[in-house]
């Protein structure tokens, strides 16, 4: 037996995250050499990430090819809004009631008089169809928590048993309803939720067609202004709607009159500004509209067209892709040419500091920035977590990589950014939304389905 008389316990805290830029000889105790599909936990240590599952059971219908990826997924007015091919669709999603009395047996007969109990029916049509697992049901009415007049095994599907438990939810989702058509050659969408007149709306842009506005009835209205046709970027600032990313005027930012996303009369407060670089993203932060370009960053300040002013933040650093820009932990975070960076406001009003934060995992960025065709990001506020996905269109989902960034308190008392690696999630588009205190982290897949992360 070895003599252990001189040995001592050496307690340490798992903190510091994944480190790929330092020798193991100088790494601190608790830092990780490998940290894949684990996340730094704001409550301490590292934990395995939660997975993802279909949030809408049926596939988003394609236009001309099953190879079409999902171009948009977002949450608006209790509906899931998605785009694929040339069309925009809506659905709704809830959970099967978790009590044992709410289970559905395979032999249970439902021929127009069945009742299915769910968590809630908010967002579902007053009558229509829904899907549980692979079985489709029709219904003729609903209450706040039940579908009534239910017929099962519709649309050539087979009856099956369905149940939910306290730890495992069973998704109940509405079949897709088309809301807009004819969006020829649409690219990936950007969107902005807003309320200028007491009515919630969402404006969608796709880089090719006219911007389109949806109201809470999901009726669509195209914005026909020629100056913003083909916009791919949109943001609301000071009650003006700003549009950018037009292929013919990539350096121009066009804004509407106040409180009207569809009016561009210059004498009533509309106008445009130009910068000397191609715009890739817009983000409102600390009373300014930040304009991210390929090689520069600007900010627009002011309260109206009379005093809007554009000033440079930096002329030396740009943003690789506008889909990486997020408000995170009191800063704006974005993907620069050398990794993740923040636009951090200091104590001096108007002073801005640009800093890189991802040097600990620089090799992962070096391996992925140049050959990734799609970049997507989400923020999980309750975890103070930012996720960035590097997607190669032809690559396998199982080989798709990403980065988790967490701002986490350290033993020193100061917060620090910690990182880990994601593998096996391949989003074509993303969105995060807080719904009645619940955080929805959605992504649309290259396979045509809508998924919810953190499942």
Positions of PLM-derived features:
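Small/polar beta-strand repeat architecture
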Residues: 99-114, 119-188, 223
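Secondary-structure transition/turn motif
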Residues: 84, 92-93, 118-122, 149-158, ...
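Hydrophobic or amphipathic alpha-helical targeting/insertion segments
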Residues: 190-226
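Beta-sheet-dominated scaffold domains
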Residues: 195, 239-240, 248, 275-455
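Short strand-coil-strand connectors
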Residues: 77, 85, 131-133, 207, ...
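Beta-strand initiation motifs
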Residues: 96-99, 114, 146, 173-178, ...
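N-terminal beta-propeller domains
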Residues: 1-99, 213, 229-298, 373-407, ...
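A short beta-strand motif characteristic of beta-propeller blades
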Residues: 55-64, 175-183, 219-225, 266-273, ...
């Amino acid at each position: 037996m070895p003599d252990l008389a001189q040995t001592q316990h050496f307690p340490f805290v798992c903190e510091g995250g994944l480190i790929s830029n330092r020798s193991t000889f100088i790494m601190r105790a608790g830092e990780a050499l490998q940290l894949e599909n684990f996340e730094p936990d704001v409550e301490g240590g590292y934990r395995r990430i939660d997975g993802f599952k279909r949030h809408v059971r049926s596939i988003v219908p394609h236009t001309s090819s099953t190879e079409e990826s999902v171009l948009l997924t977002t949450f608006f007015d209790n509906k899931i809004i998605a785009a694929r091919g040339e069309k925009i669709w809506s659905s709704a999603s809830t959970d099967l009631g978790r009590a044992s009395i709410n289970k559905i047996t395979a032999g249970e007969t439902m021929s127009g008089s069945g009742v299915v109990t769910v968590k809630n029916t908010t967002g579902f049509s007053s009558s229509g169809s829904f899907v549980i697992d692979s079985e489709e049901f029709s219904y003729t009415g609903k209450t706040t928590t039940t579908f009534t007049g239910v017929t099962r095994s519709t649309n050539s599907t087979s009856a099956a048993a369905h149940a939910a438990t306290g730890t495992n939810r069973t998704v109940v989702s509405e079949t897709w309803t088309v809301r807009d058509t004819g969006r020829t050659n649409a690219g990936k969408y950007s969107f902005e939720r807003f309320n200028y007149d007491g009515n919630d709306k969402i404006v969608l842009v796709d880089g090719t067609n006219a911007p389109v506005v949806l109201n809470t009835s999901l009726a669509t209205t195209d914005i026909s202004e020629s100056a913003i046709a083909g916009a791919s970027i949109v943001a609301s600032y000071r009650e003006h709607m700003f549009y950018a990313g037009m292929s013919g005027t990539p350096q121009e930012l066009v804004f509407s009159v106040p409180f009207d996303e569809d009016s561009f009369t210059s004498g009533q407060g509309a106008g445009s500004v130009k910068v000397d670089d191609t715009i890739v993203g817009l983000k409102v932060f600390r009373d300014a509209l930040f304009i991210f370009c390929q090689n520069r960053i600007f900010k627009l300040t002011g309260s109206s067209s009379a005093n809007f002013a554009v000033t440079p933040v930096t002329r030396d650093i740009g943003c690789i892709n506008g889909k990486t820009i997020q408000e995170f932990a009191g800063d704006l975070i974005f993907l620069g040419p050398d990794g993740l960076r923040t636009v951090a406001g200091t104590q001096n009003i108007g002073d801005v500091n640009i800093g890189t934060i991802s040097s600990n995992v620089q090799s992962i960025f070096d391996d992925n920035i140049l050959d990734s065709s799609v970049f997507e990001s989400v923020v999980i506020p309750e975890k103070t977590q930012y996720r960035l996905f590097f997607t190669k269109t032809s690559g396998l989902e199982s080989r798709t990589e990403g980065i988790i960034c967490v701002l986490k308190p350290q033993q020193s008392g100061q917060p620090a950014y910690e990182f880990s690696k994601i593998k096996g999630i391949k989003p074509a588009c993303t969105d995060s939304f807080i719904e009645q205190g619940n955080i929805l982290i959605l992504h649309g897949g290259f396979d045509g389905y809508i998924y919810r992360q953190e499942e």
